[in-house]
Every structure is written in structure tokens, then in C-alpha cells.
A protein has these predicted regions:
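Acidic, metal/ion-coordinating pockets
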Residues: 1-240
Length: 240
């Protein structure tokens, strides 16, 4: 990838069904920018299904491009997981969960989206609920891959565009991922409810955590040049 481009991404995480942020968030996101979430936007959980996820209205108003699967989006029962996904206004993404029974897809393993004039690949990582090969796979049909295993599959070939990770692993795990995967453009994280005023730079990769409960949204700006990316600016902006 040659030339100069710009990628602007707005990022939330761990909203946990807080309401009332959608209109303000929509007013902040400029044309051409992406809006993504790193998981746990909903009220339900992996074992508890909420029929009326009221936060979906705010997610729709804000116009998200992608929603990572967090603990609150995932459900062990496929039919409830699928019903939950169908009520959401943006696609779910999860790269390290495999449906070994090959049922109707609930989420994408990756997405390619356009930010201004640049294609961006979005992958997402969920903290594994049990080990690969566990007996639970035969009960529920879900296989959890270690983050490194999933990323190795994602990078099995030429890297043609910047790759952004939506991580629901927690900050410490995000640091480990950045150390081992220098080809990543950025890690936009959540799960541990930490608020970073500025991204941590690990292995020249920005790791951004905007905190929980829709209190803030992070605005990350990357410059694309010479086949890679660099951090140009970051701002943590109040929402609620």
C-alpha cells in the first residue's frame, strides 16, 4: 500500500445497555469515519437472553459499522445468539470463535469496511470461555481459539490493507497481542473497563481503551503511508 491516506475510527466498549448516547455520538462522527464497538454493549449475557435490548435503538442512531462479540453478545445457545444478532443494527464480528456444527452464521470472522478512501480490515477477539477441544464443544458447538491461533489464520497470506483488532480480551492481553503481532494497525480494546486518556504504544501499535458505560468515545486517527500506518491523533471525548 503506497501513498498517503487517513483512517478515522470512533470507538466505544462495554456500554452495558446504557441509554441516551446515540444522538450525541452520531453528531460527533464525521463523514467518512468509522464507528465500532469492542463488545458488551448489551444487557444480556452468554446464559441470559433479553428479548428487548433497548440499547439497540441507540446503536442504530449512532450508525455503527461493526460490533465485536463480547460476553454480553455471545450466547451458548445458537438460536438465541442468532436471534440477538438479528436485532442489532450492525454486523457482529468475532475471529476466534468457530461454529463446529456449521449452522446459520451469527457473526463474521472479519469485515472489510471503507474509511474515506482506504479499505480497512476489522477482526475481533473474545476472551475464550473454555479451552480449544473442551467437552463443551460437543454440547454447544462453539470452539474457542486462542488469540494467537486466530490471528495466525487471519494473517495467512499477504496483508493488503490495515488491520484493526476489536479486542474483548482486556488491557494486559492486548499488550501481549501487540508484542506478537507487529503488522496490526491498532488495537481497540475493552472488557476490563479501563479508561486510557491516550493510547498505550506497544511495539509501535496504539492500544486504545475508552472505558465503560458510554461515558466516553475514543477518536483514533491513523495515517497510511509506505505500506504501513502511524498514529496521527487521539482524543477521548465525553458522551454521557
Amino acid at each position: 500500500m503506497n501513498g498517503l491516506g487517513r483512517i478515522v475510527i470512533y470507538h466505544t466498549s462495554d456500554i452495558h445497555a446504557r441509554l441516551g448516547f446515540g444522538d450525541r455520538l452520531a453528531s460527533l462522527v464525521e463523514p467518512g469515519a468509522l464507528l465500532v464497538d469492542s463488545g458488551d454493549a448489551l444487557a444480556g449475557s452468554s446464559v441470559f437472553y433479553v428479548r428487548d435490548e433497548r440499547v439497540a435503538t441507540d446503536l442504530a442512531r449512532a450508525r455503527y459499522s461493526a460490533l465485536a462479540v463480547g460476553n454480553r453478545e455471545f450466547h451458548y445457545l445458537h438460536r438465541l445468539f442468532l436471534a440477538r444478532a438479528r436485532k442489532l443494527p450492525a454486523p457482529l464480528v468475532c475471529s476466534n470463535v468457530i461454529d463446529v456444527w456449521r449452522r446459520e452464521p451469527v457473526f463474521a470472522r472479519e469485515l472489510v469496511v471503507r474509511a474515506e478512501n482506504t479499505d480497512v480490515r476489522i477482526v475481533a477477539l473474545l476472551v475464550p470461555q473454555y479451552r480449544t477441544g473442551s467437552g463443551w464443544e460437543k454440547i454447544f458447538g462453539w470452539r474457542f481459539l486462542a488469540p494467537d491461533v486466530a490471528l495466525a489464520e487471519m494473517f495467512d497470506g499477504a496483508q493488503l490493507m490495515p488491520t484493526i483488532v476489536l479486542s474483548h480480551l482486556g488491557l494486559d492481553a492486548d499488550r501481549d497481542v501487540a508484542q506478537r503481532w507487529p503488522q496490526l494497525a491498532a488495537i481497540l480494546g475493552g472488557h476490563t473497563h479501563e479508561t486510557l486518556p491516550q493510547p498505550e504504544m506497544v511495539n509501535n501499535i496504539p492500544i486504545a481503551h475508552p472505558g465503560a458505560y458510554a461515558a466516553h468515545v475514543g477518536r483514533l486517527e491513523l495515517i497510511v503511508e509506505n505500506g504501513g500506518t502511524r498514529l496521527a491523533a487521539y482524543e477521548l471525548m465525553p458522551l454521557l
